[in-house]
Amino acid sequence: ETFCGECFYCQHGYVNNCTSPHGGWALGCRIDGGQTEYVRVPYATTGLNKIPDSVSDEQALFVGDILATGFWATRISEITEEDTVLIIGAGPTGVCCLLCTLLKNPRNIIVCEKSKDRREFIQKHYPQVMVVEPEDCETFVKEHSQHGGADVVMEVAGGPDTFQLAWKCARPNAIVTIVAMYDKPQMLPLPDMYGKNLIFKTGGVDGCDCGEILDLISQGKID
């Protein structure tokens, strides 16, 4: 992601919405060459970060994306140590959201995943995290949260029914962060959710946290 650093959106940290023709999702989208060995990067002084000597190329591989997506989603979700956080989807992006959620040390983390292999991966590597299948998720979350639902929900799966699952599992006045991208439009049943007073957050990642992410990797806080 490239950004000018000078427009209204960049000045407020919303670099995904940079108004420059060469800002936002430019490189590899509107500008060819994203998969080549060498690329000419617009606004390199604002958008590039030097990899510290203490961080290997392998560790840095996902910093620009998808680890940046998990970091951004966690930041805008306003997670506190008292929260129960539900992450829907344990694919690569879901795991990145989990890694960044762990930094916030919430009361409970629940991961909902339909794949047996992915559930076993979470259970093996993150035993402190609770894991549940989609069909049991709503009941499980209500039983393992303080206020009848998750305080924060991150929807990272992008499945046909996962958006509906996300808001149903959220407690009243919760934050529901839509990290996933969908193939089809999603229905927003406002009459059904009227009394829940939910806060929805969504959009493309603002990829301006890479320096902080590299520091966290260097310190061993993100593995």
Spans of features found by a protein language model:
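N-terminal Rossmann-like NAD(P) cofactor-binding module of classical short-chain dehydrogenase/reductase
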Residues: 154
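Glycine-rich phosphate/adenylate-binding loop and adjacent beta-alpha elements
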Residues: 1-48
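Helix-to-beta-strand junctions that scaffold the AdoMet/dcAdoMet cofactor pocket
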Residues: 170-171
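Mid-domain Rossmann-like dinucleotide-binding core that forms the NAD(H)/NADP(H) cofactor-binding site
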Residues: 50-135
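Helix N-cap at the beta1-alpha1 junction of Rossmann-like dinucleotide-binding domains, i.e.
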Residues: 115-117, 160, 183
